[in-house]
C-alpha cells in the first residue's frame, strides 16, 4: 500500500508532463521544403455543418473546377469521416503575392448559376455549411478576434482573444437574404529554413488562414488577364444568391505571404491549442480528489467490515450459529452458481475486453503523439484494426469464463462472441448509411469500403476470436474457492434500494461524474467539427474511470451478497455499466441545448450514433466492473473457512 502511494504521484507527474507537451511528428512524416515560386497546392476536403451532420464533397456545389479533377487515395479512417480530398484550381506559388485573381470566368463572361444550382447553394448557406481546404496538409482556419473587458484593470480596457475557426463559412444570411462568400483572401505563413551561404533559401508552410468575403459582381473590376481589382472601403455590397432565379457572379481569390517564427514541428499548435485547458485540469484534479477520498472511505468500511466478519467466521466452532447472524457468508454455496444465459454473458464480456484493449492502446499511443493529426484518419483506422486484432483477447477471456460457467458448446459461444456486438454495430451503421446515401452525402460509406469492412470482420476478427476462444476454453477454468450446492438457496425479499434500476442509478453517478467534463469536449469534437487532441487528459480520465467503476462494482456486489442475493453475475454487469445511462441522458441534454438540429435525418444520425456510443460504453464499464467484482468475490470467499 505504501509503495502504491509513492508510485501514484510519480505517475500523475508523468501524465501531467505528457499533457503539457506539444504535438510532435512521428518518423515518416517528413516536411516539404519549398523554393521561391514553387507551387503550393490547395486541396479541398469536404463541406460540413453541425446542423445537418451530413458532410458533402467539395464539388457537390458549383465551385470552379480544374481541367482534371483528381481525388486523393484515402485510408479507411478518411473514408469513414467523409473526407474526399480533391484538387482545386487555386494557383498559389511560394512567397508570391496575388492581389486579386479570377478563379474562373472572364471579364465579359461571369459564372452563371442555374436556378437549381442557386437553390442548392442557398440551401447549404442557410444550413451553415463550412468549407474545409488544406495547403501542405494544413487545414485552413478563420481568425476570430474576441474582445473581453479586463476586470483587474482600472480603466476596463478590452483584451483581444484570438481564436481560430476550422474552415470558413460558405456564406451568411441577413434580413432574409442569402449571401455567398465568393472571394477568398488566403494568408499563408512560412518559416525560412537555415541554409548554407551558397544555397538557395527553402521555406516551409506553418499556418494557413483565410478571410472570406462576399463581393457583388458589379463591384469587381476584371481585366483581360483574369486579374481583378477589389473595391475599396465599405462601399461594395455582398454577392446575393437568389434561389428562385439564375445568378451571375465571379469566384476570386488573393494570396498574401507572411514570415513566421513558428517552426514546422509545432505548426499544428495553432489548431490544437485550447483556451480552456484550465477547465480540463480542474476537472481532473476534482475527479482525482473525489476518487481518492471515496477510495479511502470505501476501503475503510469494507476492509474493516470484512476483516471483522472473516475473523468471526474463522473463530466460530459452531457454523450454524454463525450462519444465523451472518450476511454474505450465508450464500457461499450459491454465490458461484452459473447464471442464466452464460453464453450471452461471456460473449458480451468478451466484446468488452476487446473494447477495453482497443481503447487503452489507442489512447496511450495517441497520448505519446504517435497518431499525428497530420495523418488524416489515422486514429479511426488504428481503432478499427486494433478492434479486429484484439478479438483474440476477447475470445480467450470469453472462452475461459464460459467454461467456468459450465458451458459446453464452445463453437457456438465463439460465434456469438465474434458476431453479437459487431453485428449490432454493423446493423445500426448500415441502416444509418442507407439514409446518408439517400442524401448523397460524402459521409456515406461506399459499397467497396463496406465490403472491405465485412472482409475484415469475417476474415480477421472472427478467426482470431475463434482462436482465442479455443485456447481460453481449453485452459483451466477459474478456480472458485467454494463448492456450489445442488439445491439453490431461497432468496429473501429485498428492500427497495436493492432494486436493479435503483442500483444502476446509484452506481453510475461516480464514474460519470469523473468524466462528464471531458465528455463535453469529446461531443464538441464529434458533433461540432472541432479538433480534439488532449489525449493526456483523456488517458487520466480513462484511468479514473477504471478505478471508479471497479470501486463501485465491489461495493454494490458486497451489499447485494450481504442481502443474501447471490444472483450477482448479470446484475453486477448491468449495474457496473450504469454510467452509460447518464451518458445517454447527457447526450439528450447536449442535443437539446447545444445543437441546432431540427430535421429528421440529422436527428436520426445523432441518436443512432449515440446509441452505439452508449452501448459501447456500457460494455466497457460493465466489463471493468464485472471482473473487479469477480476478483473481489473470489478473494473474500477464499479467506474464510467453509466446512
From Swiss-Prot:
One Gene Ontology biological process: phagocytosis
Tagged with keyword Signal: yes
One Pfam family it belongs to: EMP70
Signal peptide positions on this chain: 1-23
Parts of the chain on the Cytoplasmic side: 304-347, 399-417, 472-502, 558-571, 621-643
Keyword ATP-binding set for record: no
Extracellular side: 24-282, 369-377, 439-450, 524-536, 593-599
Keywords: Endosome, Golgi apparatus, Membrane, Phosphoprotein, Signal, Transmembrane, Transmembrane helix
Recorded topology in the membrane: Multi-pass membrane protein
Subcellular location: Membrane; Golgi apparatus; Early endosome
Modified residues (Phosphotyrosine): 313
Family under the similarity heading: Belongs to the nonaspanin (TM9SF) (TC 9.A.2) family.
Role noted for this protein: Associates with proteins harboring glycine-rich transmembrane domains and ensures their efficient localization to the cell surface.
Protein name stated in the entry: Transmembrane 9 superfamily member 4
Species, as recorded: Rattus norvegicus (Rat)
Organism taxonomic ancestry: Eukaryota, Metazoa, Chordata, Craniata, Vertebrata
Gene: Tm9sf4
